[in-house]
Amino acid sequence: MKKPSLWMIAAACLIAPLSAAHARSAYDGSWDLAFVTQSGACDPSYNFTVNVADGIVTHPNLVRFKGYVAKSGSVHASVTVQDKFASGSGRFAGTSGRGKWSGRAGSSRCSGYWTAQRN
């Protein structure tokens, strides 16, 4: 079984917090995510797509997460997968989003920025 990368964890922390309480949110749909490392020993960049339906994100590697997306579009979240942890914040507006993330894999620390674009 392929282990989730720190990028997937960071993505989960930014998108996964959508909950049933935000059903049929303004953020439902398919989103392309791009993560860029600015500091640390993570991959330089990572891209993948997630789907949000009725306010719930679907991606096969989401494990433990908590957080939320406010009606204003403000995003705050964190996720843990095995020895990896990431947290992030930012904002969604219309069909795009952006923010910052930071995390660790074992004793290694990484940080950077993320962008999102609705398909």
Q: What name fits each language-model region?
A:
Residues 8-17:
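Bacterial N-terminal signal peptides
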Residues 18-23:
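Sec/Tat signal peptide C-region and signal peptidase I cleavage site
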